[in-house]
């Protein structure tokens, strides 16, 4: 089991944790429909980069 040699100071601990913060997800607005979706993902209505890529009627 790993055991530290010396105690880490509060400053060293906090500096290490400075990169751990979560960032909000990057969102995009679909050009053709104005729908908001995650970057590099198909929008809920089946459009991606202005083109219809999924036909929702065929699934149902």
UniProtKB/Swiss-Prot annotation:
Biological process, per Gene Ontology: translation
Show the InterPro entries listed in the entry. Answer: Ribosomal_bL32, Ribosomal_bL32_bact, Ribosomal_zn-bd
Keyword Ribonucleoprotein assigned to the entry: answer is yes
Sorted UniProt keywords: Ribonucleoprotein, Ribosomal protein
Pfam families named among the record's database cross-references: Ribosomal_L32p
According to the record, the residues making up region (Disordered) are 1-60
Please indicate if the UniProt record lists Chaperone as a keyword: no
A Gene Ontology term for the protein's cellular component: large ribosomal subunit
Q: Which SUPFAM superfamilies match?
A: Zn-binding ribosomal proteins (SSF57829)
- A GO molecular-function term, please? structural constituent of ribosome
Biased composition annotated in UniProt, kind: Basic and acidic residues = 11-22
Determine the domain of life of the protein's source: Bacteria
By sequence similarity, the record places it as follows: Belongs to the bacterial ribosomal protein bL32 family.
Name of the featured protein? Large ribosomal subunit protein bL32
Q: Which organism is it from?
A: Stutzerimonas stutzeri (strain A1501)
The major lineage groups are: Bacteria, Pseudomonadati, Pseudomonadota, Gammaproteobacteria, Pseudomonadales
Task: Write the gene name.
Answer: rpmF
């Amino acid at each position: 089991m790993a055991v530290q040699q010396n105690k880490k100071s509060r400053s060293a601990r906090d500096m290490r944790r400075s990169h751990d913060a979560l960032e909000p997800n990057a969102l995009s607005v679909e050009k053709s429909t104005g729908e908001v979706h995650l970057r590099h993902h198909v929008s809920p209505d089946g459009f991606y980069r202005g083109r219809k890529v999924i036909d929702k009627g065929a699934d149902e």
